[in-house]
């Protein structure tokens, strides 16, 4: 078990004190292990998944300390957002992996009889998971659950931006998991590029759209299939009939969690004009209450993040009604609400990924739907309403990776639903059975008897009788 003291001794430099990984040798080792068939064994998969649960549960303090160092995360938020979610995903898969791997027999058409057909779930081989810094365990070890359940060898590439968390992962994974089949590679973007260049069997990347394109381009020469979990501007539509008090609390909570550095955090709100002022006031009140223990604001990940987000606020776009003070020396930003910024300005054209919440006034639901649909498809879309008709209309008319009504972000943390993007917000999906299937090749298998040879009518020379039989069968 790792101690919190060992975390504190790590530096923020992801390469300091860490021997560089021989990437070709690591890939070769994992490929060799996969070739032996070890990872295909169902009991091996279950053991690795249960060991991952132990890793998360036995090292909670060390994992939380690393998250505090990297992201100023509280122990409670570390637990619910990274530790418990990852462990829960692994427990869920361990209980069901045998069922998931069973052959799925299909009823064949008449021309295919006699015969049996089924789908065989086959692991891809050696796969790469490139994690994100904002939830360094859940977005790296979480996807690994599906990859392990599917029987793959797995390379984990944590983000160098969350350096302490990456170090913890690199130290703990070999102690709990099969190091010849599951390996951690630390490093920056160059390490990711070198890994992709090895021509691995599948890649899952979580991060921004711009880097996602580069990952896709790097994988293309090898025809490596990719799962891309990207981002975008996730809207919240607050209808005129919404429970404004509850909506305000839930929106504020998620915008503050991890300092708003969450891919499915509310990026902006579209508020009906009749409740706009009340909503803004109550979001402001919720922010004030929720941040009483952080009067200096929320710390963002690094200088680049701080400069980008503070730049949105200093641009003078829209009316700042709450917060907005920035301290460059501590990288802290007071959570801000900005009312009616320019829809074509930087604040509304770029994913914010920080504690700044624009609120746009709309006159009706039609205007809100049109506003969302005039922009790239988001990773998540949210709606607050009491009316079934409003709910059904938004579900049907607003394309998004996922949607949640009357709350925010919970669609990501269930193993019973797939999580993924669409269009610019990504491709592919995982969690639960969908993660298993994402990392499995669905191989079609058909078997037929040789005697009696009922296929004789298809052999040349073709007769009129054979032609008549074919017409009846097809």
Predicted regions and their residues:
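N-terminal Rossmann-like NAD(P)+-binding subdomain of aldehyde/semialdehyde dehydrogenases
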Residues: 1-118
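Conserved C-terminal structural/oligomerization subdomain of aldehyde/semialdehyde dehydrogenase
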Residues: 3, 16, 41, 237, ...
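ALDH superfamily catalytic-core signature
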Residues: 17, 177, 210-342, 405, ...
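Residues at or immediately preceding the N-termini of alpha-helices
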Residues: 23, 42, 60, 244, ...
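Short, flexible turn/loop "capping" segments at secondary-structure junctions
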Residues: 27-28, 227-230, 258-263, 329, ...
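Structural signal for hydrophobic packing residues in well-ordered secondary-structure cores
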Residues: 34, 38, 53-56, 60, ...
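Residue-level signal for inorganic ion chemistry
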Residues: 45, 90, 151, 182, ...
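Rossmann-like NAD(P) dinucleotide-binding subdomain of oxidoreductase/dehydrogenase enzymes
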Residues: 109-246, 362
